[in-house]
UniProtKB/Swiss-Prot annotation:
A single cellular component GO annotation: virion membrane
Gene: NA
Cofactor: Ca(2+)
Transmembrane segments: 7-27
InterPro entries, sorted: Glyco_hydro_34, Sialidase_Influenza_A/B, Sialidase_sf
UniProt cross-references to Pfam families, sorted A to Z: Neur (PF00064)
One of the record's GO molecular function terms: exo-alpha-sialidase activity
Assembly information from the UniProt record: Homotetramer.
Protein's UniProt name: Neuraminidase
Subcellular location, record wording: Virion membrane; Host apical cell membrane
Length: 469
């Protein structure tokens, strides 16, 4: 092969290689264009589930799932479903109470950023249960916790966090400015009721899904107050009870019916010689049953039951097993107020089962210490003091406090009945202990028809804290 032939051959090979390279580049461009077109078309269609991109810089826990993080992770968000909580079922048959949650907030608060709180309560939607609480605008073991024994101040707010978690600035959601409160879920949204303002002119602010929907002005100008536990929702309507008037004499009591946070009906109870405060309410077969605190003159607890039209009945728990604190020793009951040692009181609850009643109460008859659940099979209608079952919750030597009811609807549990539950506040600090603050943790139990335990689940914090010394 002469020189010219070699030149022609090399040129031909280079031309062929160049053409192949050009074709590969064109193919690459076409491939990228097709891929981009497919992605663009996919983004133009509605997505089955929303996604959010979360970028982390270290290994961490997110929503109780361990994530090994070195780059961006795409997390699919669960769709939120809305239903109407019917509230038409009866209470589940139970034989005892299983522990459900314990937040240990005072123990954790000795070293962590934990709110100073009182009046915690629990309420459940069809998706979750949350702990609601009234903060003092202060943290434990901090100087602003000084003097938080005071009930009503402009710094108090209603907040909530997932049940069982210690309430802190990092896991809590603001709900309302309030020194008295209630909250409940109708299946579509959270209703919150927060009362704040001066004693002689307080206002209840109603919010639905965080938006103000209505207000209630104090009608007696004597410390308007509400349940300090969950309100009740049935078939899209929610119900609560409020009190206005003396804490040691005849006051005024009103039931309110609300839909999506707006008041559609209210009535005042005709209840002479009755005293209703801090009612613990629950749904049962389409009606509302409330068991309350008589701070005026009774050792037993008053109740009110009403339907969705607010037609009501009133009474006192007849049992000689008395539920208030302070109270008389168990003895002869009364279907009206038991007047012996009945002044003052504490928020509490009971669950009615026909003629029988589960009574939650402190173990002490004079101080807020200890807690027990007692089953009196005839206690709703009979006045004797016999009972058939007792379950220990808090030992007599440990502090308790307020207690109240909440329920889990069939839409949450998958059961065909409404599960009864209760919470107990474990108050620590002033006025019984040598601290500058008053706060509390909480435990909760739910009714089961299987084995349960007798024990004590106290707060357990070692006091005083550093700030107290």
């Amino acid at each position: 092969m002469n020189t010219n032939q070699r030149i022609i051959t090399i040129g031909t090979i280079c031309l062929i290689v160049g053409i192949i390279s050009l074709l590969l580049q064109i193919g690459n461009i076409i491939s990228l264009w097709i891929s981009h077109s497919i992605q663009t078309r996919e983004k133009s269609h509605p997505e089955v589930c929303n996604q959010s991109i979360i970028t982390y810089e270290n290994n961490t826990w997110v929503n109780q799932t361990y994530v090994n993080i070195s780059n961006a992770n795409i997390v699919a968000e669960q769709g939120v479903t809305s239903i109407i909580l019917a509230g038409n079922s009866s209470l589940c048959p139970i034989s005892g109470w299983a522990i459900y949650s314990k937040d240990n907030s005072i123990r954790i608060g000795s070293k962590g950023d934990i709110f100073v709180i009182r009046e915690p309560f629990i309420s459940c939607s069809h998706l979750e249960c949350r702990t609601f609480f009234l903060t003092q605008g202060a943290l434990l073991n901090d100087r602003h916790s000084n003097g938080t024994v005071k009930d009503r101040s402009p710094y108090r707010t209603l907040m909530s966090c997932p049940i069982g978690e210690a309430p802190s600035p990092y896991n809590s959601r603001f709900e309302s400015v309030a020194w008295s409160a209630s909250a409940c879920h109708d299946g579509m949204g959270w209703l919150t009721i927060g009362i704040s303002g001066p004693d002689n002119g307080a206002v209840a602010v109603l919010k639905y899904n965080g938006i103000i929907t209505d207000t209630i002005k104090s009608w007696r100008n004597k410390i308007l107050r509400t349940q300090e536990s969950e309100c009740v929702c049935i078939n899209g309507s929610c119900f609560t009870i409020m009190t206005d008037g003396p804490s040691n004499g005849q006051a005024s009591y009103k039931i309110f019916k609300m839909e999506k946070g707006r008041i559609i009906k209210s009535i005042e109870l005709d209840a002479p010689n009755y005293h209703y405060e801090e009612c613990s309410c629950y749904p049962d077969t389409g009606k509302v049953v409330c068991v309350c605190r008589d701070n005026w003159h009774a050792s037993n607890r008053p109740w009110v039951s009403f339907d969705q039209n607010l037609d009501y009945q009133i009474g006192y728990i007849c049992s000689g097993v008395f539920g208030d604190n302070p109270r008389s020793n168990d003895g002869k009951g009364n279907c009206g107020p038991v007047l012996s040692n009945g002044a003052n009181g504490v928020k509490g609850f009971s669950f009615r089962y026909g003629n029988g009643v589960w009574i939650g109460r402190t173990k002490s008859i004079s101080s807020r210490s200890g807690f027990e659940m007692i089953w009196d099979p005839n206690g709703w209608t009979e006045t004797d003091s016999s009972f058939s079952m007792k379950q220990d919750i808090i030992a007599l030597t440990d502090w308790s406090g307020y207690s109240g009811s909440f329920v889990q609807h069939p839409e949450l549990t998958g059961m065909d009945c409404i599960r009864p539950c209760f919470w107990v506040e474990l108050i620590r600090g002033q006025p019984k202990e040598n601290t500058i603050w008053t706060s509390g943790s909480s435990i909760s139990f739910c009714g089961v028809n299987s084995g349960t335990a007798n024990w004590s689940w106290p707060d357990g914090a070692d006091l005083p804290f550093t700030i107290d010394k």
